[in-house]
Each structure stands twice: as C-alpha cells, then as structure tokens.
Amino acid sequence: MNENHYLLLTPGPLTTTKTVKEVMLYDWCTWDVEYNTMVQDVRNRLVSLATKEEEKYTTVLMQGSGTFSVEAVIGSVIPRKGKLLVCTNGAYGKRIVQMAEMLHIDVVVSQTEEWEPTNIAEVEQLLQQDKEITHIVVVHCETTTGIINPIVDVCKLGKKYGKVTLVDAMSSFGGIEIDIAELQIDFLISSANKCIQGVPGFGFVIANRDELLKCKGQARSLSLDLYDQWETMEEQNGKWRFTSPTHVVHAFYQALLELEEEGGVRARYNRYYSNQKLLVHKMKEMGFKPLVDEKYQSPIITSFIYPEAGFEFLQLYNELKRYGFVIYPGKISKVDTFRIGNIGDVHEDDINRLVDSIAKGVVIG
C-alpha cells in the first residue's frame, strides 16, 4: 500500500513521492542566495525540458495555481488593440474566454464538443476571415475529458498567418514530449503540481524571449505582470517580486531531479501511457466505456461514461476512498461521466489494485 493515506488518481494535485514531501519539512528564506540560485536552476531546467534551442527561451515562475499563470499570460501578452482566438472544447478553454472577457480583450472562439478535438479547418477559416486576430491559444490536454488537442496543427496555422501562439500545457508538460521551438510556440504555460509531480503553489511560463520583451508595460494587473516578474528574476538572480512559495519550490526542484532519474519526459510518458492503457483495458472488461475516442485520448486522465441509469458515482467514490483511492467526478454537461487520472507516483500495481477495488465496489448490468 502506498504510504499516502489516499492514492490520488486525479490530474493534479496528485500523489507525490516521499522524497518530494520530505524536502518540505524545512524552512527557507526568500532572500537567501542558495534559494535564489536554486530558482535559477529550476528556470534553466524547465527551458531544457522544453526545447533544444534554449537560447531563444526563458522561464517565468508565478505564484498561485496554474490558472494564475494562464491569466498572467493573457493579461500581459495581448496588447490593448489585440484580439485573441481561443480554441476550446472544455472547461479550461472556456476559462480562458472568461479571462479575456474580464480583461476587456477582444476574443473569438472556435468551439467543438467536449469529446472532439479542435477543428483545424474552422480555426483556419476564422484566421482567414478575421484579420484583426493577433494571438491564438489552445489547451493541449483538456482534463475536462482527457482529450488531446492537435497543437502541432494549431501552431502551424498560427505561424502561417503570423499570429503569436499560446499553449496551455498545464496537464501535459513533463508528461508528453513537446519541443516549443520546433512547434514555434511563443508562450507555454504549466504548473508545479502536474506531470513534473510537484505540489501546488506556483505555475510557470516558458516564453520566447523576443515576444516576452514586447510585453513590457502591457499588463492589466500588478501581481500578474509577466514581464515585471521575469525582469526581476532575470536581474536579481532568481528573486521573486513578492513572497514566493519556498517549500513548493524546493519540492519542485526535487521533482525535477526525480524526473531526470526516471529517464526524462519520454520515460515518464511511457509509464503514464502504460498506466492508461491498462486502466482502460481492465475497465472495459468490467463494462465501462471511455468517453473519448482512443485516437484522441491522452495518457493523463480518462473519462468513463456511467454504465447504466442507476449508477451512483458517489457510492463508488466513497467505496474507493475506503480502499485508499480518490478519483474525480465528471465535468461535462451532456454525458454523465467520472474520471480517473494516472499521473503522479502511480504504477502498474496501483492500477491493478484500483480496478480490483472497483470490481468490489460496483455491480454493472
């Protein structure tokens, strides 16, 4: 049994290793040279994970949940006369639309059903029709359902039409290989508590240096000013403008070391992929059907359709919690689903124990 009181089968926060937890038992000063040097190391390691063309990119760390970092990008990168095209097929794409509207940014939406990927033909049509669009954003892994969106195609279109490209890779970065230089991504956003397997407390933005320099003075918020945050970290050896989550940063640094020890992003992807395939195979044997078509399914989290009208998710949830597992309810409106994640410190034995527990906790048919 895992040392945790529960194994979190969620898309983040997730189950972390004992060693990641242990580094949070100590206290650190935000002004300490050793701490700030470590912050710089974290920033450099993130760029190295993101691309081989490291000199073109830089990292900004931002306090708060991943959503704070997304809003920092939306509010800092798009100028007053800019216009944003949002590709959405889930809650997190919709949240970006909400942000843009709250910040009085002109926004155009390309929306597909939650179980269907971004419609590339529609995106191109919108780019052809609306010459005022300056920026385009897509969510890579939409954890509303677990679907993977075609960021390669979206980014190609963005560059074909001369747009600044933003990718919300919150639940994919560190777990799925991405080279932001190859894809010509200008701003990629993720969080400490996802595939790198840290804990919640900050997000990060890996940015094209040339595009980031254009953001000076554009921010619509003091605390979420992406350029000012970067400039302070760059000029003052890793210093944050405001109090940083020191324990979380140390845990994240440890998580980065453990990602490297595992064999890097490809090795972690292989583990997640194997977990997800095993999970789906076993769940199908019990009569559960995945919502998303296999060719669009991510290795991060899987949505399962309720097997029958009388199925009680809460009953299954409570039963699994009794066995030491926590899963997620569904998040879409048109189909009754629940979700099971397989990222974090989760392995084949854990998946086998989970499905055995599900078999005990629910009767289908």
UniProtKB/Swiss-Prot annotation:
Gene Ontology annotations of biological process type: organic phosphonate catabolic process
Keyword Heme: no
Listed EC numbers: 2.6.1.37
Transmembrane segments: none
Catalytic activity: (2-aminoethyl)phosphonate + pyruvate = phosphonoacetaldehyde + L-alanine
Keyword Kinase set for record: no
Cofactor(s) required for function per UniProt: pyridoxal 5'-phosphate
Molecular function as annotated in GO: 2-aminoethylphosphonate-pyruvate transaminase activity
Keywords from the UniProt entry: Aminotransferase, Pyridoxal phosphate, Pyruvate, Transferase
SUPFAM superfamilies the UniProt entry points to: PLP-dependent transferases
Location of N6-(pyridoxal phosphate)lysine modifications: 194
Alphabetical list of PANTHER family matching this protein: 2-AMINOETHYLPHOSPHONATE--PYRUVATE TRANSAMINASE (PTHR42778:SF1)
Entry-linked NCBIfam families: PhnW-AepZ (TIGR03301), PRK13479.1 (NF010006), transamin_PhnW (TIGR02326)
Described purpose of this protein according to its UniProt entry: Involved in phosphonate degradation.
Family: Belongs to the class-V pyridoxal-phosphate-dependent aminotransferase family. PhnW subfamily.
Subunit architecture: Homodimer.
Entry protein name: 2-aminoethylphosphonate--pyruvate transaminase
Gene name for this UniProt entry: phnW
